Amino acid sequence: DLPAAHTTLTDILRRYATEPEVGDIARLYLCRLYTLRGQLFDAEEELQHATRREGEVLRQAPQLYHTAAAELDLARGEDSTALTHLTVLARSEKTALQRARLSFLIGQLLEAQGAREAAKAAFARAERTSPQPALELAAQLRTLALTTESGTGIHHLQRLARLRRYAPHRSAIYLALAEALLASDQREAARTALRQSIDSAQTLRGSATEAYTRLGLLALEDQRYV
């Protein structure tokens, strides 16, 4: 309930106007709330107010500060600055799942910037850390997508598809396998992988929908060049 949260936080600012330690924490939460609402100017203003006492908020609530700053930077499209805050958060995060999520996000941002090796390292950290098979697999798939040796990636994906641990996610694995096969110009094998993606899907959404689309595009390409 964002309106209720806003009312509570502004009330805290009024009640504790003479206690900057309390006010700074409230302002960091307000920064996050405004970022969520898309009110980025207001979010920036609250962040500046919260950090006006140099170093204090970093000592008092480092996790909250870096979270608020990273969210605002991401909302403004300032990914490089956000990476600095996210890296600090990932290093200090105590829960394995959240640490893995942060590493995965860092990997996505680095990949978007073209820093392939750094992205692979971040995805590898997410894979090692994640207690959830779905996130672990997603990190593996991103690492394989960044692997330049297509044969290695294809064999690894084929092995993943056979593992019972990833049975609920086979549709996504076969889709990634199809993309790797297409990249190495193995069209018939890619078609087989796309059909396996569809057949192994629990619902006709997500990976299965994309596999159907890719099969259709391949058929159109075949007709065009016959």
Regions found by a protein language model. Name each.
Residues 1-226:
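Acidic, polar-rich low-complexity tracts and alpha-helical solenoid repeat scaffolds
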